[in-house]
Amino acid sequence: GYAKVSKNLKEIWNKNLDEFLKLRSSIKLFVHLIDSRHTNLDIDLNLDKYLKSFLKPDQRVLKVFTKCDKLNQSEKAKLKNSFKDAILISNLNKMGLDDLEHEVIKQTLGL
């Protein structure tokens, strides 16, 4: 994103990251952090599409909506309804962090 490096170096990084994500069989969970106030940004939609293009049956994408303290109750309910398996968090008031920790442990360690 914001690194001041040559275009060639960025392409090398992209290639290496792409290979790592696609070939690493030990990855069981991708955690996709999304700003809860901006749920349909192109960057998030593109990442979702990219991950789904190579997701294996034993892998999962967990959508985590951040900054939920900035939403009212009706906006939170709408978000939960639209994204059933997502987790809503707020670092400011620590909302949802226990749920996130539990889900990451469950998905990665099976506990």
Please provide the spans of the model-predicted regions.
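Canonical P-loop GTPase G-domain recognition
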Residues: 67-111
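Amphipathic alpha-helical transducer elements in NTP-driven molecular machines
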Residues: 10-14, 45, 94-97
